[in-house]
């Protein structure tokens, strides 16, 4: 079984993880079935997926609780749990809070919901506007020294915020948006993360299915669908993106897989990226994602895709 090391941490993970926002994330998806979500987590662990990525905001703690229920059925040491916090309830809304007290409290509350003694990777989910980022990370380092967390991550940070957060060299992982249609991170983040041995975990890797070969140039989306608001899905740009994605079909055919496996394998071929955490709602989607780990792209494949989406 392939394993990858996350940044400076001692965490070893299978290169395909599971994003669990559809496990108990009732505030994100309507009509979620909790038993289906729990079965998805079970299937992930049974099939060798070691990393489960969750967050307080996924169902306002419910995702963590459901994962905690499933964890009891397995050896805790076989699973790498990543969770995130930054959302503090204020009236009927949420505000971002990176204050040391709030983050420490969040770690303790996540431990209870997950029904575990330690969290493998704890992220600051979003930056707030006022807390010095090194102070926020130092609070998490106290939790690490206490054995409550094993490694520290930040998510959605700018490069300047990341540098401030990593002032004492304590950040193990950065999670941020990166995909073939938005390669900005290659310029902004990758030189820094590479130099400081910080693992970059991309989210939004298939751009709402656009890079999965699911759509044609004539595909339209219902009124109110979020994809209508995304630049990549608008007008001529959408059609051009579809044409590019279709050019990946021969490579997929050659490797006997589908287009999304080729896209995901291209990310994993980058030295800055150790693991991907595609989401799934059903076990069959998860099993399909796992196939990516068996795809080894040739240098020719990698260069072709690089130029196609330059």
From Swiss-Prot:
GO CC list: cytosol
Mind telling me which Pfam families this protein's record contains?
Aldo_ket_red
Q: What is known about its induction? A: Induced by inositol. Repressed by glucose. Is cotranscribed with iolR, the repressor of the iol operon.
Q: Residue numbers for the site described as Lowers pKa of active site Tyr?
A: 84
Q: What happens when the gene is disrupted?
A: Disruption of this gene affects neither growth on inositol nor the inducibility and catabolite repression of Idh synthesis.
The UniProt subunit note reads as follows: Monomer.
Q: Report further notes.
A: The 3D-structure shows a unique architecture for an AKR active site, which may explain the low catalytic power.
Task: State the protein's name.
Answer: Aldo-keto reductase IolS
The opening ranks of the lineage are: Bacteria, Bacillati, Bacillota, Bacilli, Bacillales
């Amino acid at each position: 079984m392939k394993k990858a090391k996350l940044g400076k941490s001692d965490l070893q993970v299978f290169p395909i993880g599971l994003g669990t926002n559809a496990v108990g994330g009732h505030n994100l998806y309507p009509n979620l079935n909790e038993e289906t979500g729990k079965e998805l987590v079970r299937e992930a662990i049974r099939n060798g997926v070691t990393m489960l990525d969750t967050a307080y905001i996924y169902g306002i703690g419910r995702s963590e609780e459901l994962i905690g229920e499933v964890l009891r059925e397995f050896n805790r040491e076989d699973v790498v749990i990543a969770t995130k916090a930054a959302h503090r309830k204020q009236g009927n809304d949420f505000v971002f809070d990176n204050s040391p007290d709030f983050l420490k409290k969040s770690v303790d509350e996540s431990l209870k919901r997950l029904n575990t003694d330690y969290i493998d990777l704890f992220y600051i989910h979003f930056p707030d506007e006022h807390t010095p980022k090194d102070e926020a990370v130092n609070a998490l380092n106290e939790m690490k020294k206490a054995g409550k967390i094993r490694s520290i991550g930040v998510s959605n940070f700018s490069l300047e915020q990341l540098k401030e957060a990593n002032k004492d060299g304590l950040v193990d992982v950065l999670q941020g948006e990166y995909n073939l249609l938005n390669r900005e991170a290659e310029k902004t983040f990758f030189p820094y993360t590479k130099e400081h041995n910080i693992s970059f975990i991309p989210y939004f890797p298939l751009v709402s299915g656009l890079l999965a070969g699911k759509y044609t140039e004539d595909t339209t989306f219902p009124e109110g669908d979020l994809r209508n608001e995304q630049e990549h899905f608008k007008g001529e740009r959408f059609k051009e993106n579809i044409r590019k994605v279709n050019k990946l079909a021969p490579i997929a055919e050659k490797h006997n897989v589908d287009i999304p496996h080729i896209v995901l394998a291209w990310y994993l071929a980058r030295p800055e990226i150790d693991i991907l955490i595609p989401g799934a709602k059903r076990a069959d989607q998860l099993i399909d994602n796992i196939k990516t780990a068996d795809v080894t792209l040739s240098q020719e494949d990698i260069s072709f895709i690089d130029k196609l989406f330059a």
